[in-house]
Curated annotation (Swiss-Prot):
InterPro entries: Ac_transferase_dom_sf, Acyl_transferase_dom, Acyl_Trfase/lysoPLipase, Aldolase_TIM, FAS1-like_DH_region, Fas1/AflB-like, Fas1/AflB-like_central, FAS_meander
EC number: 2.3.1.86, 4.2.1.59, 1.3.1.9, 2.3.1.38
Annotated function: Fatty acid synthase beta subunit; part of the gene cluster that mediates the biosynthesis of sterigmatocystin (ST), a polyketide-derived furanocoumarin which is part of the most toxic and carcinogenic compounds among the known mycotoxins. The first step in the biosynthesis of sterigmatocystin is the production of hexanoate by the fatty acid synthase (FAS) units stcJ and stcK. The polyketide backbone is assembled by the non-reducing polyketide synthase stcA by condensation of the starter hexanoyl-CoA and 7 malonyl-CoA extender units followed by cyclization and release of norsolorinic acid.
Protein name: Fatty acid synthase beta subunit stcK
Region ranges (Acetyltransferase (AT) domain): 17-395
Biological pathway: Mycotoxin biosynthesis; sterigmatocystin biosynthesis
GO molecular function: (3R)-hydroxyacyl-[acyl-carrier-protein] dehydratase activity; [acyl-carrier-protein] S-acetyltransferase activity; [acyl-carrier-protein] S-malonyltransferase activity; enoyl-[acyl-carrier-protein] reductase (NADH) activity; fatty acid synthase activity; hydrolase activity
Induction of synthesis: The genes forming the sterigmatocystin biosynthesis cluster are co-regulated and induced on oatmeal porridge or the fungal isolates were grown either on oatmeal porridge or in YEC medium (0.2% yeast extract, 5.0% corn steep liquor). Expression is positively regulated by the cluster-specific transcription factor aflR that binds the palindromic sequence 5'-TCG(N5)CGA-3'found in the promoter.
Superkingdom, taxonomy of origin: Eukaryota
Family: Belongs to the fungal fatty acid synthetase subunit beta family.
Catalytic reaction(s) noted: acetyl-CoA + n malonyl-CoA + 2n NADPH + 4n H(+) = a long-chain-acyl-CoA + n CoA + n CO2 + 2n NADP(+); holo-[ACP] + acetyl-CoA = acetyl-[ACP] + CoA; holo-[ACP] + malonyl-CoA = malonyl-[ACP] + CoA; a (3R)-hydroxyacyl-[ACP] = a (2E)-enoyl-[ACP] + H2O
Pfam families, sorted: Acyl_transf_1, Fas1-AflB-like_hel, FAS1_DH_region, FAS1_thioest_ins, FAS_meander, MaoC_dehydratas, SAT
Region described as Dehydratase (DH) domain: spans on this chain: 1009-1509
Amino acid sequence: MTPSPFLDAVDAGLSRLYACFGGQGPSNWAGLDELVHLSHAYADCAPIQDLLDSSARRLESLAAIPHRSSFFAGRGFQLQAWLNDAAASAPLPEDLALSPYSFPINTLLSLLHYAITAYSLQLDPGQLRQKLQGAIGHSQGVFVAAAIAISHTDHGWPSFYRAADLALQLSFWVGLESHHASPRSILCANEVIDCLENGEGAPSHLLSVTGLDINHLERLVRKLNDQGGDSLYISLINGHNKFVLAGAPHALRGVCIALRSVKASPELDQSRVPFPLRRSVVDVQFLPVSAPYHSSLLSSVELRVTDAIGGLRLRGNDLAIPVYCQANGSLRNLQDYGTHDILLTLIQSVTVERVNWPALCWAMNDATHVLSFGPGAVGSLVQDVLEGTGMNVVNLSGQSMASNLSLLNLSAFALPLGKDWGRKYRPRLRKAAEGSAHASIETKMTRLLGTPHVMVAGMTPTTCSPELVAAIIQADYHVEFACGGYYNRATLETALRQLSRSIPPHRSITCNVIYASPKALSWQIQVLRRLIMEEGLPIDGITVGAGIPSPEVVKEWIDMLAISHIWFKPGSVDAIDRVLTIARQYPTLPVGIQWTGGRAGGHHSCEDFHLPILDCYARIRNCENVILVAGSGFGGAEDTWPYMNGSWSCKLGYAPMPFDGILLGSRMMVAREAKTSFAVKQLIVEAPGVKDDGNDNGAWAKCEHDAVGGVISVTSEMGQPIHVLATRAMRLWKEFDDRFFSIRDPKRLKAALKQHRVEIINRLNNDFARPWFAQTDSSKPTEIEELSYRQVLRRLCQLTYVQHQARWIDSSYLSLVHDFLRLAQGRLGSGSEAELRFLSCNTPIELEASFDAAYGVQGDQILYPEDVSLLINLFRRQGQKPVPFIPRLDADFQTWFKKDSLWQSEDVDAVVDQDAQRVCIIQGPVAVRHSRVCDEPVKDILDGITEAHLKMMLKEAASDNGYTWANQRDEKGNRLPGIETSQEGSLCRYYLVGPTLPSTEAIVEHLVGECAWGYAALSQKKVVFGQNRAPNPIRDAFKPDIGDVIEAKYMDGCLREITLYHSLRRQGDPRAIRAALGLIHLDGNKVSVTLLTRSKGKRPALEFKMELLGGTMGPLILKMHRTDYLDSVRRLYTDLWIGRDLPSPTSVGLNSEFTGDRVTITAEDVNTFLAIVGQAGPARCRAWGTRGPVVPIDYAVVIAWTALTKPILLEALDADPLRLLHQSASTRFVPGIRPLHVGDTVTTSSRITERTITTIGQRVEISAELLREGKPVVRLQTTFIIQRRPEESVSQQQFRCVEEPDMVIRVDSHTKLRVLMSRKWFLLDGPCSDLIGKILIFQLHSQTVFDAAGAPASLQVSGSVSLAPSDTSVVCVSSVGTRIGRVYMEEEGFGANPVMDFLNRHGAPRVQRQPLPRAGWTGDDAASISFTAPAQSEGYAMVSGDTNPIHVCPLFSRFAGLGQPVVHGLHLSATVRRILEWIIGDNERTRFCSWAPSFDGLVRANDRLRMEIQHFAMADGCMVVHVRVLKESTGEQVMHAEAVLEQAQTTYVFTGQGTQERGMGMALYDTNAAARAVWDRAERHFRSQYGISLLHIVRENPTSLTVNFGSRRGRQIRDIYLSMSDSDPSMLPGLTRDSRSYTFNYPSGLLMSTQFAQPALAVMEIAEYAHLQAQGVVQTQAIFAGHSLGEYSSLGACTTIMPFESLLSLILYRGLKMQNTLPRNANGRTDYGMVAADPSRIRSDFTEDRLIELVRLVSQATGVLLEVVNYNVHSRQYVCAGHVRSLWVLSHACDDLSRSTSPNSPQTMSECIAHHIPSSCSVTNETELSRGRATIPLAGVDIPFHSQMLRGHIDGYRQYLRHHLRVSDIKPEELVGRWIPNVTGKPFALDAPYIRLVQGVTQSRPLLELLRRVEENR
């Protein structure tokens, strides 16, 4: 083994060792067990075994000597046998605890521990002794201390054995003789059991007593001794409240019984009991010791022991080291005895001398380590006494022995030094700073706050004053602003803003809040949060008074307020411990403890000032982040300095316990700047006060009962004790506390108040600030119920208005008076003008005069009972200042009396008689004696203390050779782990190579040391930005990482430059520089800051200068000059976003228009963009690609980037682009315009459409358009949040421009038209024809201008009004028609937009979003998709043009306060949109109409994200899909977006005749407004034009219906019918101009007749379409087609080709014409019909050709009409028209063929047909065709539609169409590519090939002529 480095440190003088040894005590029980353990553990260690063997022999021989006690008779001292087999042969533990055994065993244990330690350190006992500075022993431990002191180094182990033998002999005889001399116990068994049951243990001769001080214990002992009992002795003083009593067991039991009646239970709450009156928490415990050591009871022992030891001698000069013990009542070093024998002294020190253990321990006060060799917990006793001296106890006995022996062999620092409180926490002198003439005092508090060590506490009302607080701060002291005196948000905010403007920029504010007022605290914390986080007020800390919140609440405040320190005012030991729990939970946050104890002014505890700190000091100092401040009772230098240097505790027998600062409170109330009324100041100065130096047993505590020193303690409104001056008012308060407010029973209180009513009222009126309210005109007290309205008014004014100063005490009192007048008005009023006048009066004279004028004698009416209650409620009203009077004696009397009782001390003028004796004046009983002068300036008060302290400090430093100045920096090693260093002259480089690095704080501390500017730049959390505080961006940016390089450059030995070079280790050369942060300290107080990054091959830089601010002490703080800094940032971003070669936009205004470059979209650029965006997302999505020329919608932002960012750089915005947050971005294609394609050339224009200023900054919205050939293609809208408000010196212009949604008004009544025309803002372009029945479309935009407070100031609304196409009432309005007028309105001071309000009430948006009734599509399996955020942002930055370095450079992102680089919001947006594009399968990028992402949180590279999709609405035929993106790890939403998607290509098909049925469409009619509107309009048209109820026909299907022509309207209807039949009288057979009616008949019901089936079907289908449109599901550009009749329905529903009513008339005409085209029998039936045929049901290979052949054969065989007229579904569905006989044959032939084995054979078909020809001859038009296997008759169809039979009627129908179809109504864009006509089956077109196709099918001669002209013009 190598020598111990620890002992090397001892030899070098770095450590000083002492030894201590234990004695009798609880360890007596286990002494032998430990001996056995050590004997076995060191069985192979010869020196240890030799000691055990020799000791065992000695003890065995001594026990064999005959003795008068006969103790060892029959049992002896067989130690060796016990060591070999203790279980079998050793005595019982209770016997071993007896002194004859325990005394030598304990001595041997200590010797053995010492020997083992020496052996382990490779020393002999003498060599170990040579390392010691001295030794002490607790009781018998002094024998071992003396033994090791005589162990010579020259003789090694033998010398030690001889010394051990001496110690054992002494121990044996003292133990035996003491046991024999002890008084015998006379306790009976029950008395012993009593002690055991009370937890006191088995009675013995020593009793441990803890919890009492020495004075109490001595009084108790004297009392018991005086009662004539056996003698009791205080034998050992183990600590400040730890004692041992010696005596006979029955005498000691008497002590136990006496203490049982006076001691307190540990669970008893005595926090409200003044500490001198508290019952002590006492613990008593008998010790297992069989003799009353250290008492006169053993006075006979010394002679007997000396006789027994015979010729043994020990001289003082035999001791090689000091050994301390008690001798003759004092502490002695036994070496001082010289040649005299000290054995008798040693014996007496154990038997009769009292042990003063603290005195023994203080003999080792220069120790660094005390080696405790036991037995028992003697080391703990040393630790208790010497804690705080820098000493550390090393326990080398018991269970900790082995581990501590190992530590002794490790290193010199393995055993840490204890804290030397006096040196570590005492004030230090800091040498004079530059610009200062004097040195200053430094403590933990001064280092934190940068102010002197004396501060001013938060006090209500004194430090509620911004002026006083500002004066203290300007005097360069720390003070707390008291929030407790503010009752609403507005006044607190105003005061704090005023204060922040009044203090130096480098100083900050600490706010004091009251935890016991939870309601006020809640809103005050919210106010502070807003002022700190949103306005940047320099509020750095809070102090919490009147309670300790939970750690969870504190965490919430820390996170919410971003405070730099938090202070608490604990009132007890338990509260201190709760603060320490908080401090341990937040070890990096400075936590202040302001200890004031019970002597504080104002609210106070009942604690002594000193005792709790003595108890808690060690625990407090174990939390390095705790700052300890002493308050209460202070006011000068002499009384405070002992608490600063810690000497106060030395007087009490403790180590020095310095505080970090001094807190002054009520002392400041007499300061000149305090608002305390002068009369109050005089009373304070006159109060004598009391002293409290810790030795007067708390004289101030008597304030609880009566005035002491002019101060008394009363119970405040919060129910807490409060110290106040003993004015008449406060003596009354105290009296009422005792007499009335202490009564808890409401009935008893009521009775007491009633009994003493007169006395109470008189005392209030004579002595208190709040007089009795109700009094008569002759000033006689009465009750409110007896007052008149006039008397109430007069008394209110008298008590709330300060007449001689012509002011209301508080503005809320004027409101109270006005509210009472309103109450009176409600009772007495008549609504006269005079009544209204008094509500505008503001003085009592005016108010009373107006009241008299209004009511005269009525005012003398006594208050109505209801009004009494209302008046009391007004007095109680929350939010107003509590009333300054007592209105009644009721259950709330204490509240009336005490509420809001502190303000009067600052406004005696508002008190009755201006009598200061009537008010509550906060003062402390001790502190008040220091206030001797009124109106002393705060600076003089505070400087007087600190300057005197400085003189005292300089004097102490001059006499202390070991004193260290604060400026002296401890030398540190030059190396930090993980960092390589190189030096080149004055340049030092640090290469951060890893693999691990020290913390940033450690690196910064190593770099800057005592460099003030470096500390300000790299360590200060805040900087001054403009006039407010902001996080220090340099500190945030300076976070060195592995691979980085730091350069430090020095000049004249001073740090001048610091540069951090950032490199990316994963990208090649570790020295490759990606960015840099450079700091240069310029001459004077300037610091230059440079940030470099790399972008597009350039190195754009941010360069600016900062100013150093600060006083002559404490840390400096940097100030960023806002204008210069923002100019620098704008230059950087101009370079990044726009380019140096382009003109800067900073000089133009907020209303300017900005343009981007002219850009041609190339496939290469788009593909590069897609490649970058496609790198993130699920694997399948990354592998997926799109095609086609359409440009992705996200790329529009890339094109528009320059135009979108130019406005941000406006100087007028006063914005910091580094603090820019992208809130949202909306991109949408202009409807109806071809989207962007590759190859398009576009330009961009933009402008600011919103600029609003909030408490946290600005919200700026920029709108832009991409224009192709001058026309908008894409519209963009992006919103930025710019943190930090603009300065008041720049433009505060706020506005919002809104493109309102197109609004539609249906002018469906004359009333609505008149209302519209009455609006002044509705301006027609010229005379307009009747607008009734028309639809107006409003396309408007609004501009709102806001005032400085953000409230709307003016509104401008303008835009155009257009007439919708005539048919748009049927379907949703999808197009805009002709302009007919405009809207223009300007208005100031408005609440809402009146134009939009009108349009919303009378109209609706043109495009309405329709929520889905149930959750829609969620992407199926892709409803929740996980993916990884982009791994890097450089690629996106390059392709997008957004080269903002916060996305790519850690230095810049940290500088901006964002931490690590943030993924571009638009990069994430493009990634998410592409994933959605993949999910919907939009391969050609055509389905996105708009994309609007909003960004909710920051996303870092490689974050795991989850994407959720929900289709939740439809809008104008498009799907509206909501997308959420969340972080997988936390569930935090980081983005949400809305996509408007075209549906997959949809075709709308309308059915034809044959599908009608009774009641069709009526279910929808009953449930859907849009469908009902269509039916109702059709109904109105048919009734008005044709006298028919279409709804009746549909609902009832009548077989006949008569239209009467008798009336005038009936004749008009007849004329309409006649005009329809002019060209074809067969249409309405029998109708003439003389017809008085006309009846329609049809046997199957009119709904089955063609004439009514066709319009009914058309209306039903258009209604269905309108329903779909109202749900927003109709695709606006969808393809549509109609089957036969359905073609009319499709054109009516999907186009504006014809007005709805005209279309219905056309279809009715068509139906009538077809209905009567063919002859009918008497029952109205024709010979024709139609069937649907499905050839596949005959056989699967029966094809279309076979069906056509079959139809031809049937027609041929029957000789009548049969044709295939509709080709619906290939090989599946066809419709055949023909004669009923041929249809019958076809149906039966199909049935036969389906059973045939060869149905395709022509022969088989002919045979089947032939088989049915004979039977068909009996088929007539009355025969009902039945359904066959392959055929279905079309019910109600008896016309062979689409057959050759009807061709002869085409010309007539063509003429009708030409007459009714207007070319002007036809819009080709509604038809081309969308309509699929029946005749072609191909989408409609207007090109020549399509015309040729139509002409070929129809043989149209006009089309043939058109084609000829086209050919000629080519």
